């Protein structure tokens, strides 16, 4: 089926690419795609296109990659050119998903039907850059995707629709991301169909209560503080997969931990200092925490691959009594 509603799309990572693909496959014309500039990535630090750019180029869509859309910012000339391109590209609505650039009011006012954002949380909880990570880290029982009519605030726009999903005990940011991306893609296509049919999308202002902010994940957060309870550390490991990983330092070597679960403690574990390895078995490496203990079942040494505990221990022996370093506390 083909549609007449013209969609400018703005997004960057895989989460956004899933939405762009759904919009395109549903038959909506996409006259322009905005995405962030190519960035150095990988071991060779070669310039790599975003997931959104790769999809757009493969399907013959026009792509623009302005470093900013703010005339008063660091790149005023590039911003002015991009805004002019938006003004001169015939379209009806803009869809934004994990774009990574701020949209000033001038840009929000250009599309006839405004700008719709796909956000990976149940707003107003987890506004901001890392909603999936923070939901897992906080131990939330559920999360979801919210469509909102954008305004100049940080994820403060009126809500059009949401989809809720449970967070499973073994969910990581990677697994939860994929389910949320699929839900976001489905929601936005349904919303665009209604917008084309009805000419408008009713929206409800966000409640003032329940607002939390999902700060961007920093590499410095990767270090595991063994003084924390085991269940908190298990959530941190899951939240930081695939980035930046949970890091445990032993004799100066940073070992990444990719899968872990709290375990019941006995007297030996309870008396061990936080960070102490109390068992190194094929089933997992058990480490004493501030409260309880953590069984680590997937590890990665520097320069190596993710390995199950059995394979990791075969090449990098660990022993009871060794102790992971405790990070400095601010």
Curated annotation (Swiss-Prot):
InterPro entries, per the entry: Fmt, Formyl_trans_C, Formyl_trans_C_sf, Formyl_transf_N, Formyl_transf_N_sf, Formyl_transferase-like_C_sf, GART_AS, Met-tRNA-FMT_C
Keywords of this entry: Protein biosynthesis, Transferase
GO molecular function: methionyl-tRNA formyltransferase activity
GO cellular component, one term: cytosol
Enzyme Commission no: 2.1.2.9
Domain of life (superkingdom): Bacteria
Stored NCBIfam families: fmt
Family: Belongs to the Fmt family.
Physiological role: Attaches a formyl group to the free amino group of methionyl-tRNA(fMet). The formyl group appears to play a dual role in the initiator identity of N-formylmethionyl-tRNA by promoting its recognition by IF2 and preventing the misappropriation of this tRNA by the elongation apparatus.
Protein name: Methionyl-tRNA formyltransferase
Organism: Burkholderia cenocepacia (strain HI2424)
């Amino acid at each position: 089926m083909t549609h007449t509603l013209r969609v400018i799309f703005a997004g960057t990572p895989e989460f956004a690419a899933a939405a762009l693909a759904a919009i395109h496959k549903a038959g909506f014309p996409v006259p322009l795609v905005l995405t962030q500039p190519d960035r150095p990535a990988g071991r060779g630090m070669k310039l790599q296109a975003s997931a959104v750019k790769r999809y757009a180029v493969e399907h013959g869509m026009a792509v623009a990659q302005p470093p900013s859309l703010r005339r008063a910012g660091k790149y005023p000339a590039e911003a002015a050119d991009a805004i002019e391109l938006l003004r001169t590209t015939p379209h009806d609505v803009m869809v934004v998903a994990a774009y990574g650039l701020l949209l000033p009011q001038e840009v929000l006012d250009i599309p006839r039907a405004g700008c719709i954002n796909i956000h990976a949380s149940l707003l107003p909880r987890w506004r901001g850059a890392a909603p999936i990570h923070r939901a897992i880290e906080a131990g939330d029982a559920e999360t979801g995707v919210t469509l909102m009519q954008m305004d100049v605030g940080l994820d403060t726009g009126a809500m059009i629709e949401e989809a809720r999903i449970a967070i499973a005990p073994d969910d990581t940011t990677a697994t939860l991301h994929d389910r949320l991306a699929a839900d976001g893609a489905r929601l936005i296509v349904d919303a665009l169909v209604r917008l084309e049919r009805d000419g408008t999308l009713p929206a409800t202002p966000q409640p003032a209560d329940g607002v939390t902010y999902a700060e961007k994940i920093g590499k410095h957060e990767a270090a595991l503080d063994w003084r924390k309870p085991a269940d908190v550390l298990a959530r941190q490991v899951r939240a930081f997969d695939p980035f930046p990983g949970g890091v445990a330092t032993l004799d100066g070597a940073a070992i990444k931990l990719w899968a872990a679960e709290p375990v019941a403690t006995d007297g030996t574990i309870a008396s061990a200092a936080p960070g102490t390895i109390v068992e190194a078995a094929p089933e997992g490496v058990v480490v004493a925490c501030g409260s309880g203990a953590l069984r680590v079942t997937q590890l990665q040494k520097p320069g190596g691959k993710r390995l199950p505990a059995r394979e990791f221990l075969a090449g990098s022996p660990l022993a009871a009594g060794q102790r992971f370093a405790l990070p400095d506390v601010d």
